[in-house]
């Protein structure tokens, strides 16, 4: 009986040690308050109250290059892509401005092939590595069709991924970041509905 207990103890110790070693071998790219985390480039399609925003990260803090190429830097070589699926919950008109509020979910992917803006599905073809709740405010100038946005994401799921033989985790559960877009809306009814670029910065929880 004593021998059995000793074997059980050592098996447990090995499992704990292995788990600790695995955790320590992972590099977490932290979400830090006031630090620029991601640079984003994308497009969006609106249909009724539904909005899908998709694109890639052109810069990620912690990585020297967010592309698989050092010369071609666009959606075809992006290592990280994202898709946001959101629903409009409020629209307020004020002079030349239309203010739109949305909520939804954002997923960041480790891309596994060239993405193509003519096929939005290619931006979700990779491995999901971060999921977050999302709330957005859009301020659209209806005279110029230009817009600015601010939105907050709170991370709800993070998956370990491997890049160049190193295990990473993008962000931490419960942490939040704020993103600002500058964009141009397309002609109503045209595809895509518009284009945008911006940055994400860590925010205080």
List each model region and its residues.
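Bacterial N-terminal signal peptides that target proteins for export
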Residues: 1-11
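Bacterial N-terminal signal peptides
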Residues: 10-19
């Amino acid at each position: 009986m004593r021998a059995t207990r000793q074997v059980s103890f050592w098996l447990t110790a090995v499992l704990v040690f292995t788990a600790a070693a695995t955790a320590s071998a992972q590099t977490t790219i932290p979400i830090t308050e006031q630090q620029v985390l991601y640079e984003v480039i994308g497009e969006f399609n609106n249909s009724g109250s539904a909005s899908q925003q998709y694109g890639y990260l052109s810069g990620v803090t912690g990585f020297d290059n967010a592309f698989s190429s050092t010369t071609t830097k666009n959606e075809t070589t992006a290592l990280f892509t994202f898709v946001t699926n959101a629903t409009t919950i409020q629209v307020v008109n004020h002079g030349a401005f239309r203010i739109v509020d949305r909520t939804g979910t954002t997923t960041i992917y480790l891309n596994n092939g060239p993405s193509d803006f003519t096929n939005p599905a290619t931006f979700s073809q990779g491995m999901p590595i971060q999921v977050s709740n999302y709330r957005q405010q859009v301020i659209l100038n209806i005279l110029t069709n230009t817009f600015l946005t601010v939105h907050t994401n709170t991370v709800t799921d993070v998956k370990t991924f491997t890049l160049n033989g190193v295990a990473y985790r993008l962000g931490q559960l419960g942490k939040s970041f704020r993103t600002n877009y500058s964009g141009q809306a397309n002609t109503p009814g045209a595809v895509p509905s518009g284009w945008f670029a911006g940055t994400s910065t860590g925010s205080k929880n």
